[in-house]
Amino acid sequence: MNPADADEEQRVSSVPAHRCRPGRIPSRSAETETEESSAEVAADTIGGDDSELEEGPLPGGDKEASAGNTNVSSGVACVAGFTSGGGVVSWRPESPSPDGTPSVLSLTRDSGPAVPSRGGRVSSGLSTFNPAGATRMELDSVEEEDDFGASLCKVSPPIQATRMLMGKKCHCHGYWGKFRFCGVQEPARELPSDRNALWREMDTVSRHSAGLGSFRLFQLIMRHGPCLIRHSPRCDLLLGRFYFKANWARESRTPLCYASELCDESVRRFVLRHMEDLPKLAEETARFVELAGCWGLYAAILCLDKVCRQLHGQDESPGGVFLRIAVALTAAIENSRHSRIYRFHLDARFEGEVLESVLKRCRDGQLSLSTFTMSTVGFDRVPQYDFLISADPFSRDASWAAMCKWMSTLSCGVSVSVNVTRLNADVNSVIRCLGGYCDLIREKEVHRPVVRVFVDMWDVAAIRVINFILKESTSELTGVCYAFNVPSVLMKRYRAREQRYSLFGRPVSRRLSDLGQESAFEKEYSRCEQSCPKVVVNTDDFLKKMLLCALKGRASVVFVHHVVKYSIMADSVCLPPCLSPDMASCHFGECDMPVQRLTVNVARCVFARSDEQKLHLPDVVLGNTRRYFDLSVLRELVTEAVVWGNARLDALMSASEWWVESALEKLRPLHIGVAGLHTALMRLGFTYFASWDLIERIFEHMYFAAVRASVDLCKSGLPRCEWFERTIYQEGKFIFELYRLPRLSIASARWEALRADMLEFGLRNCQFLAVGPDDEVAHLWGVTPSVWASRGTVFEEETVWSLCPPNRECYFPTVVRRPLRVPVVNYAWLEQHQEEGKATQCLFQAAPAIQNDVEMAAVNLSVFVDQCVALVFYYDSGMTPDVLLARMLKWYHWRFKVGVYKYCAS
């Protein structure tokens, strides 16, 4: 190594974590907080009475750590004392540097016995990464940066390799960061005086986009694009094309770039094996994406700035992205032990046909991975999953090993779900630590992970979490979302107008968490009220405070007993500590669970009327327009999604540790979601109110196709999942039989034949549908998210671009920056409009106006969803807590598992 390079590397690596430069926002001095007992907190905030607390120490009582609180909004995480088997993790201030740099907070660990993980060693993540042989990118100019993960990189080396791959070098200055350009200007509020001159200038610059021309085109689009779209929504497509042209000079259009050492070994071997055929396929894909793709400005930003990566200084082309995804999925299918069976169910004879089939589904947007997985699949030493559900009982101590595992997962861009009320640590300290570190990650990465904090509402620690949300709004953590596990006993007492509700310490609350059956939980709860220490609160006030936190702190409501009662598990199971961060996937095991999302685009099943003979088939639903919905195409897409999901599970288990394989083999969950439901209804000319039967029929066919494909895999010779005997499928039941018997559109003979095959051969998978938000995937393909209705004909969404980006002279933390908001056009509404003044009447309903219709449709479709349905609730500024409580009681009676995913102002 060059001595100069060695000195530079040593200089950069010596930068301490969370370093503050002169001129930056200084951190607050630590302030000692007054200790409050659980009874005082209950009486002050919730409305409880000190006399209601029985004598004796509260199990699981929390104390404020004396380490102090730092300003989380300035980007510094707060840790307040985590016990780790005799060792204590604490923050200590370092002495100021001679140049006057403010003191920094460094993470130290007192001496104490180490706490090994389950494998006898500290595990940094789910996938088995190989840090040895990790390539180092040589930068033209090494810039001094804040290595906020320096202390964590020593424990988890794969983080540094992941950050090298995730980063980009900007085209304008050559700075290493997360964006392709620097200096996003404030968008213009008014239209330019001469719009034709502006369009001519964009066209001229796009023809000479090499060098600084691309930066000039980028500035013109960001400056005038939002205002132009608001004035004329149809120009959104043209601006999207110009946005792609700004990147043409730096794009790599050869598929041989995926033979790089940055890519996975299976992808490299596949590319080298088919190096003669891939260039032609890449050229056809690029031409299709350019001509047939519906890329608006917001979709183009998602594609180029969140999905595309940079390989050796060159950006991926949009066509190359879909080719990489198809190659990675094909390699996962071919490298599986069951590749022959997978090819049979995909109706392909060799891997070339598999590649063509997968590529067609990907580029058309019929089947889609999440935007995070689309950006990482095919690369080496990066996670191949979307979320992590942390349910490992060995993490209850919140030790250094557990914190490193969660932080390393966040550093890779993966969102995490954690139940803080079941940890042997101060809940507020865990939230501050994980939330502060997550905010630091969100400053550096394009994919912004979140920490979903779950709270058991029968634990006394829930009071501390509610106080934390209500009182510390000034230092709100942008990367933290909350979820409240509401038991049935709380809803029943509110319905019966009982004023007393009890909260227990951790030993008692954990014992209650082991009782998944509603009757057993209520019986043990009544017994504990008579014999155990407790905190008594007012039921109405407690629920109102919880809903106020939901409106203020981006929290969701989970009816945890409904999750167990209407699940596939036949045996008695524990109450799940947490769902997935998107509130769609359930997990019933006592181990960490990675979640892989796969979305079916329902809007791609709508076709124009061209074949008159096909219109009379039983699987065809005619619309009020000249379009029809083909249910047979939907079943075909779901069948291929099941094959893709099983191949991805095989690839994930082969690259992970033994305990990950053991967790996935129990139920082999697929987590299949939907997108574009409201877009399909608008194109058919239907309203949500008139489409309840159609929506129920769509999800019936999806569930039937998923179960049939899983049975056929076992029928072909694959083994059934391990927990098949513990599910309702062992008894010959389907998920909709746990509810009322719906009106089935599929013939009963087909259901009975499926039941007989299921009892004879078993199921390869036991969890299929999980209707999550998947909003970025929907916006990428120009459709509505999930089963939600469209918010409007033209509405705004936040982008990854910031109006106050960091530079060498000034630094703004995440909470100070203002993200660039770009209008998003509803193309289903735009399709039926002509020129200005000649617009036809299009059937369109905004989401706040048809919220009740969407909820009723969710009630009908939830009988076929074996996991959860995440909904959006639109509220008015004048809505009182009593109205929210009434709606919450309605969601409970409708047997929703998740009361609401998020709250939005109408």
UniProtKB/Swiss-Prot annotation:
The protein's UniProt keywords, in alphabetical order, are: Host cytoplasm, Late protein, Virion
Comp. bias (Polar residues): 98-109
The record's subcellular location field reads: Virion; Host cytoplasm
Any GO molecular function: ribonucleoside-diphosphate reductase activity, thioredoxin disulfide as acceptor
Q: Is the Nucleotide-binding keyword given for this protein?
A: no
Q: List the disulfide bonds.
A: none
Alphabetical GO CC annotations of the entry are: host cell cytoplasm; virion component
Q: Where is this region: Disordered?
A: 1-70, 89-129
Q: Does the keyword Nuclease apply?
A: no
| One GO BP annotation of this record | deoxyribonucleotide biosynthetic process
- What is this protein's function per UniProt? Does not possess a ribonucleotide reductase activity. Betaherpesviruses probably use another strategy to expand the dNTP pool in a quiescent host cell.
What family does the Swiss-Prot or TrEMBL record give for this protein?
Belongs to the ribonucleoside diphosphate reductase large chain family.
Official protein name in the record:
Ribonucleoside-diphosphate reductase large subunit-like protein
Tell me what organism the protein belongs to.
Answer: Human cytomegalovirus (strain AD169)
